[in-house]
Every structure is written in C-alpha cells, then in structure tokens.
Amino acid sequence: MNFLMSEEQSAIVDMASRLFADFCTDETIQQFWAGDEPYDRALWQALREGGLTALILPEDLGGSALGMTELCAVLESQGRRLAPAPLWPHQLAVAALAKFAEGAPGMAELADATRLATLSLEGLQQSRGLTLHARKTDAGWRLNGRAVAVPQAEQAALAVLPAQTAEGVRLFAVDPAQAGVERIGGRLTHHEPAADLVINDLELPTAAALGEQALDWLGPRVAACLGALQLGVSGEALKRAVAYTSERVQFGQPIAAFQAISQKTADCLIDVEALRSSLWQLVWRLDAGLDAAGAAGVVRAWTCDTGHRVTHAAQHMHGGVGVDVSYPIHRYTYWSRALEIACGGVTANLEALGRWLATPALTDADC
C-alpha cells in the first residue's frame, strides 16, 4: 500500500509551506501578536491567489474540489508556523453552505474569500450544551440565545451557527452584522479574534437552516482540521525542544544526553505519531465516504492529549528561556491549549468515544 502523497498533493503542500515560511517567521508572528489585526491580510491574499482558500470547495464555485487530505496537509504546515489565517473555518463554513444550504447569499464572494465565513464550534464539542435555540415559525425560524467565542465573528460576513431545535441540533446561516445580533469581541488564548453573538428574536427564512445532515457532515471535518493544526503545532514544538536541548550544555554535555530528557522527548514523539496515525485514518475515511464518527472521536481525544503533553514538555525542556515571552516557544503552548479547548477537552471526548464504542449496532466496518 502506497502512503505517499501524489505529485499534485506534494505541490500543494510545498506551495503552502513556502508561503507560511515567507510570511510567518518568529519575528513577524511576534509583531502580529503585539498588534490589533484580526489576521495576516497579506498572507490571506497570497493564500487566495494560490487557491489555498478554496481547496475543498466545488468547481462550480471556483474551488479545486479536492478532499480533506489536501486541506489537512496544508493545515499541518500552518500549525508549524502558527500562521494567523482563518483557513479552515472559512473553507468548512463555505463548503457546508454550498452542500446543504439553498441559495445562501453572497456565495461567489465567500468562495473567492473576498468575504469571510466562519462557524461556531458549539454543538461540535463534547463538553457543553448549546445556549442558542431556534423555534419554527410560519415564516421560517426565530433564534434566541448566545453563540460563544465564534472565531472571526466580527470580520465574517456569514456565520454557520448550531442551535437547539425541538427535533435536535440544526445549523443556521446567520449574518453577524444584521439587526438582532450583538457582537461582543475579544481574543482567544492564541491571539485569534473571536466574539460572542448574542441573538434576540432573530427572524430567519426557512432557507437559512442547513440540511439535517449538515451537522454530521461538519463535525468529523472540524475534528480533522483541529487535529491537523495540532499535529503541526506539537510537532514543531517538539522539534524546537530537541534542537534546544541538543545545544544547551550543562555539566559538560548537552542536556539532551541526560536520560530524563531523552525519555521525555521519546514519549513526546510517540504522542505526535499517535496523533498523526489517527488523523490520517480519519482523513482517509472522510475522503473515501466512509463513516467517520469513531475515527473523529479518536482524533479529538489525541488532539487534546497530545497537544497538552507535548507542548508542556517542550516548554519545560526550555527551562528559564521557556518563560521568556520574547522567545517563541510559549506561543506553541498557547496555540496547543486553544486547540485543546476547541475540541472540548480530553475527558469529555473519551467519554463520548466510550459511548460510541458501547453502541450495540457498531460493526467492524465502522471502526
């Protein structure tokens, strides 16, 4: 079995890696964190011109109609450089609208990434319930409640939000700037802008509700994107820790030669490779059109666990340098924690995975 990327896939990853390397040095990322920009606009323009903002979008919208394999390979490169660009929430939101929404407004501009789309992770996490509710009306739907920490919500022209209905959770396309929506902005742990959307008696047409299968389609893909970013973040944090401990001399030898350090880095490598294996299993299942609920649960758990252990260890191995915020390693810890929180936490995900494993109808084909 050939696990290597195709020529086309390798070319996409190479282009993305070059762009992230050019725009996202340690110095430029430090400057970005010191500023107020929501994302790197020059990088976003370069990603648009390279077609990387439309990898999974259908061809009739100007996309490449590629799969999660290509997107996640690019996201791993993004994670390594901590690139400040809303690459995955924009693409998944637009792809979901294209697949499950009837005539969503402004799709051409969204597909071209001249206007941003985003999505809420509530309802896709395993750790808490929804605070946004939707009730059917004669004219369509009425929404009330709050969508918490929606990424880029103050910049987005359209947001895909999950809301609790009488029949279950449903996704809705909402313009965050319209009347009836209040945006309360802030920054997440890794400096990404986000906003709570407080919604009061927002009337939406029937077409604003995405198809009933949209949530099941979106959830595993969100897990894959978060896992790919975590793979890049954790892998690069480990790489930097290995480089530092190989150069840092104490008691006449590099500290990497000490048993405690070598064993800790070996444990970290096992964690990173476990995440890598589970991620590509999930991505393969998604692109093959197979059920991916169980694989997504495994990836969410590893995304939380791997990131927490690896970046904590990498920070620790840097010693006093690791707590100096002029040195870049702390930003990997912040990114890793943000991704862990976005996934809902390891405990909640392991509990959800246990419930899935206990499902009586589970067969070998589902694993």
Where do the PLM segments sit?
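Alpha-helical interface subdomain recognition
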Residues: 1-81, 136, 140-141, 220-367
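Short glycine/proline-enriched turns and hinge-like loops at secondary-structure junctions
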Residues: 66, 128, 152-156
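N-terminal glycine-rich flavin-associated loop
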Residues: 84-103
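A short, Trp-centered hydrophobic/proline-enriched beta-strand micro-motif
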Residues: 112-124
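Active-site-adjacent elements of ketosynthase-type condensing enzymes
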Residues: 125-132
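Generic beta-strand structural signal
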Residues: 134-137, 164
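A short core secondary-structure module
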Residues: 144-181
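Flexible, small-/acidic-enriched active-site or ligand-binding loops
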Residues: 149-150, 175-206, 213-214
